[in-house]
From Swiss-Prot:
GO MF assignments: L-asparagine:sodium symporter activity; L-glutamine:sodium symporter activity
Pfam families hit by this protein: Aa_trans
Record's catalysed reaction(s): L-glutamine(in) + Na(+)(in) = L-glutamine(out) + Na(+)(out); L-asparagine(in) + Na(+)(in) = L-asparagine(out) + Na(+)(out)
Species in which this protein is naturally found: Mus musculus
Annotated protein name in UniProt: Sodium-coupled neutral amino acid transporter 7
Biological process according to GO: asparagine transport; glutamine transport; sodium ion transport
Amino acid sequence: MAQVSINSDYSEWASSTDAGERARLLQSPCVDVVPKSEGEASPGDPDSGTTSTLGAVFIVVNACLGAGLLNFPAAFSTAGGVAAGIALQMGMLVFIISGLVILAYCSQASNERTYQEVVWAVCGKLTGVLCEVAIAVYTFGTCIAFLIIIGDQQDKIIAVMSKEPDGASGSPWYTDRKFTISLTAFLFILPLSIPKEIGFQKYASFLSVVGTWYVTAIIIIKYIWPDKEMRPGDILTRPASWMAVFNAMPTICFGFQCHVSSVPVFNSMRQPEVKTWGGVVTAAMVIALAVYMGTGICGFLTFGAAVDPDVLRSYPSEDVAVAVARAFIILSVLTSYPILHFCGRAVVEGLWLRYKGMPVEEDVGRERRRRVLQTLVWFLLTLLLALFIPDIGKVISVIGGLAACFIFIFPGLCLIQAKLSEMEEVKPASWWALVSYGVLLVTLGAFIFGQTTANAIFVDLLA
């Protein structure tokens, strides 16, 4: 029997002990990171975390469900109907779950605790930098989507409060979409985004969970007991072409992308074992699948091909139950934007410190000035783009391709490199099978990323 071992030499796997380079996803790179000592628990140590298995399932579900939910009915319409939408999600689920398991396996092998750290350690510097850039761009695009969602929900709420029909001309200046988004962003989002640390994640998580489940329940109820004034458009039963099916990929990738936050969750478990983690992510993805399918199917069948990219915009403004759903979504997004910005800012800060060769131990004044400048630039750019891109579907079509990188490409590369690092005399069939699967993941991810990004640029953005 060939002896199989994984190179666990931390000095060879790790890239650097610099905090800017190894910044935790939800921690500023400027904060000192205590190096792992010999007495510190490793990811495989049963005492390394406090999260139960059930708690891990809940956290992964919470990380998965989000703003992409509102775009799923339109994705079913794009895919060509209920059958195509279900088949696409079921087919994707296998790769989504396997990617999460691969990341946990590589986290144990490399002794790293965040997504970008795992990629850095397993795949090397170049791939690690690309991963960090992808995370920064992805969080930037998601922040734009959040601002668009705020505008979508405010339009409907303001229409009721001002007692004006949807799309009425000659509205007062203070009800203009650009003004309301800007006012909300400056009053609430910017002050929450500037601090160095964020302590409201638990409230944001609670709001996200409540809001997501409430929106799903309302969409299902409105399908079962529809309002008399709602008339569905054409109900597609088959895709116009096979390319139409792939055009729904960005929404599905964006909706199910929880891979970036999955590695810290895995390492926070009481028993971070790959087998246990496989059960956790399978249960979590089945729950997320049920929510997304319920929303997608019922929302699509309610409005048909006429469904809006933001499904809540398809409902009448006067509907009280839907208005409550809009309020939940706004509150959730107001607290989620600063968290996503914080993740992106941490990555940008790490890239900047490494590029400049700056030491982590800097005076507080320089760090504060740089943080405020980064926050203002990030905030103003996302706000400006959100004001002139009123369709959430156009944003998701772009960042959905990046989500495919986190689901397919980086886990595939990690699997290939992890298997290549094993010191074996004879390669068994399972070794070749796993390497081949890694190649399949990378190939499939590259195809989805290329196809969806090209389609987003030439069809959605330039249309």
